[in-house]
């Protein structure tokens, strides 16, 4: 007897794995990452940690790029970012 709600536990869908806690995934992986942030004023690119606990300023024009919150850092309005690859 096969039920429609059967889920393959060895090969779960990626969407369901992303919703789980980082320690309860099939393969543990962190939620944090490094990112390249482009300054809106001088277009300098700075590498920033996603869960930064300090204010990050642009080395070129001293503009604040991101501010810490309780979890992920909040980017300043107008700054663009891209996730760094492995």
UniProtKB/Swiss-Prot annotation:
Domain of life according to the entry: Eukaryota
SUPFAM superfamilies documented for this protein: Zn-binding ribosomal proteins
Keywords: Metal-binding, Ribonucleoprotein, Ribosomal protein, Zinc, Zinc-finger
Cofactor binding comment, as recorded: Binds 1 zinc ion per subunit.
GO cellular component: ribonucleoprotein complex; ribosome
MF (Gene Ontology): structural constituent of ribosome; zinc ion binding
Pfam assignment, any one: Ribosomal_S27e
Start-end of C4-type zinc fingers: 39-61
Keyword presence, Metal-binding: yes
Cofactor(s) recorded in Swiss-Prot or TrEMBL: Zn(2+)
Gene3D superfamilies linked to this entry: Zn-binding ribosomal proteins
Entry's Gene Ontology BP terms: translation
HAMAP family: Ribosomal_eS27 (MF_00371)
Similarity remark: Belongs to the eukaryotic ribosomal protein eS27 family.
Protein name, as recorded: Small ribosomal subunit protein eS27
Source lineage: Eukaryota, Viridiplantae, Streptophyta, Embryophyta, Tracheophyta
Gene that encodes the chain: RPS27
């Amino acid at each position: 007897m096969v039920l429609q709600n059967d889920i393959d536990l060895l090969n779960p869908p990626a969407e369901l794995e992303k919703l789980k806690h980082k320690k309860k995934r099939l393969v543990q992986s962190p939620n944090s990452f490094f990112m390249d942030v482009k300054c809106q004023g001088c277009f300098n690119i700075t590498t920033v940690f996603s869960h930064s606990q300090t204010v990050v300023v642009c080395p070129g024009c001293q503009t604040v790029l991101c501010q810490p919150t309780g979890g992920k850092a909040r980017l300043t309005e107008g700054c663009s970012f891209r996730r760094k690859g492995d």
